[in-house]
């Protein structure tokens, strides 16, 4: 079934020893509307409810969030306390809290968009047990205010979302993730610790376990095949010709939702202007735009006010939109991990979707320059030369992928 299980635990469907009678199935149906769990979800949830640390590595759209949200409800009902969810993106936590509240689950977030008064109120309510889940960024954990709250509150679980951010070998290393284990060590009682990510190589998995100090975790690695996605690579012959190909593709798929990834902000602006000039409702997203514009573009795309998003890889983690029918890459990504994560935004509803990569030898030079300017981390544990060699190895894998798929026959959706 494509699932590997390490340190498997026995099934635990309820907290019988604590007088807990609410069945897992009833909770699943009542709050989330599902009749059953997917393969892999059950094992992770059983592990959490048995008091075990867990690590879930599951592809985009496989239902990672449910693996901690459902047991959080079960544990809160059993009097175990609140679940802290550590998320790297403000937009992601806002979307998830909104969805949870709409489902009748009491959840809140704390981030820089709130006033000091709102933060104090949220922490007060969490301490009183009014919330099942509390979402925070990793940077929040080390503040005196949050440490004071965590030292007094009853915490059932600490969940680390996008856990690959803890590894320098991953594509989205975030130094603040390295402080999570120290935060957990400061708690008066160690809660269950769960970690989830969509993409992680063996070395990244080892880093997650080691850097989070997971204790003999139940580890689930599901298969990464997405049979509803059709992949192809086409030759990018020249600027104007490629632009016409992209424009014609979007026109052929009028009314469908799509994402176009570009390697540089300059290309994002160029492709975005091309689409808008031709009457296509397109948004743009890159680090050079204001936070307000990025937020507005993401919301407009999420709620189908825009049909196309043109973006750099800054538009990546946590994009919760199920009906994306295509993902185009105007440039080759730096690694297969990046490509899998970005292309994986398509077809999350299980319907057919297409992933097209426009490849040019020029992309190799662009990516080499981007890697040369990549800011090296301050962690002395890994040599900069090792990191550069690893980045180059990943780039070479990406190049081989493009060479192999170039000129392949079109997918059924082109017919």
Task: Outline where the language-model segments fall.
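Conserved pre-motif I regulatory segment
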Residues: 16-57
């Amino acid at each position: 079934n494509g699932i590997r299980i390490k340190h498997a635990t026995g099934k635990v469907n309820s907290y019988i020893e604590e007088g807990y009678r609410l069945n897992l199935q009833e909770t699943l149906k009542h709050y989330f509307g599902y009749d059953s769990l997917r393969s892999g979800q059950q094992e992770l949830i059983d592990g959490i409810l048995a008091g075990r640390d867990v690590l879930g590595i599951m592809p985009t759209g496989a239902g990672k969030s449910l693996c901690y949200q459902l047991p959080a409800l079960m544990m809160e009902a059993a009097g175990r306390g609140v679940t802290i969810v550590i998320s790297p993106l403000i937009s992601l936590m806002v979307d998830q809290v909104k969805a949870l509240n709409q489902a009748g689950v009491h959840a809140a977030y704390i981030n820089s968009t709130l006033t000091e008064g709102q933060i104090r109120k949220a922490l007060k309510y969490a301490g009183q047990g009014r919330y099942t889940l509390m979402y925070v960024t990793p940077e929040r954990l080390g503040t005196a205010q949050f440490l004071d709250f965590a030292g007094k509150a009853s915490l059932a679980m600490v969940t680390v979302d996008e856990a690959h951010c803890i590894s320098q070998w991953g594509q989205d290393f975030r130094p603040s993730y390295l402080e999570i284990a120290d935060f957990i060590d400061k708690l008066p009682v160690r809660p269950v610790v769960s970690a989830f990510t969509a993409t992680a190589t063996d070395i990244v998995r080892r880093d997650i376990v080691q850097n989070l100090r997971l204790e003999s975790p139940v580890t689930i690695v599901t298969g990464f095949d997405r049979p509803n996605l059709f992949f192809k690579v086409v030759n990018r012959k020249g600027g104007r010709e490629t632009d016409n190909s992209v424009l014609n593709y979007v026109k052929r798929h009028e009314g469908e939702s799509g994402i176009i990834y570009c390697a540089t902000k300059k290309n994002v602006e160029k492709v975005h202007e091309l689409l808008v000039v031709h009457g296509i409702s397109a948004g743009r997203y890159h680090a050079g735009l204001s936070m307000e514009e990025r937020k507005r573009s993401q919301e407009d795309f999420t709620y189908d006010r825009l049909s196309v998003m043109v973006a750099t890889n800054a538009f990546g983690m946590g994009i919760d939109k199920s009906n994306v029918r295509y993902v185009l890459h105007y440039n080759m990504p730096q690694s297969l991990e990046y490509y899998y994560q970005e292309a994986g935004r398509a077809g999350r509803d299980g319907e057919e979707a297409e992933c097209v990569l426009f490849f040019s030898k020029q992309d190799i030079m662009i990516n080499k320059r981007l890697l040369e300017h990549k800011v090296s981390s301050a962690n002395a544990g890994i040599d900069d030369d090792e990191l550069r060699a690893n980045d180059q190895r990943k780039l070479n894998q990406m190049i081989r992928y493009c060479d192999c798929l170039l000129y392949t026959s079109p997918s059924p959706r082109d017919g």
